[in-house]
């Protein structure tokens, strides 16, 4: 797995296996399709070192925005780019906004931008 790490973004080669996609569809009682559901991209976040610093945090997802220009296919390698867009302290919570973008042959496939909050204890 090839990856690049900068302060606020990271790139990895990623793919979705047939078995993992079939299991995802099974969870929702849907027939299997070779098209990867857009929200399955959430399974990629933990693969990025940039996101691992939040692994033991109690983050609450508050917003998801999806911009998909192409279908995501099973067993196809994409370049995943995770970017830390914003970290803002608002009273007793911290709000994090991150974007995961998949490209294939330098063509945009999907961007999933998600906002999380973490309450300070």
Curated annotation (Swiss-Prot):
InterPro entries named among the record's database cross-references: UCP032370_VraC
Superkingdom classification of source: Bacteria
Protein name, UniProt field: Protein VraC
Gene: vraC
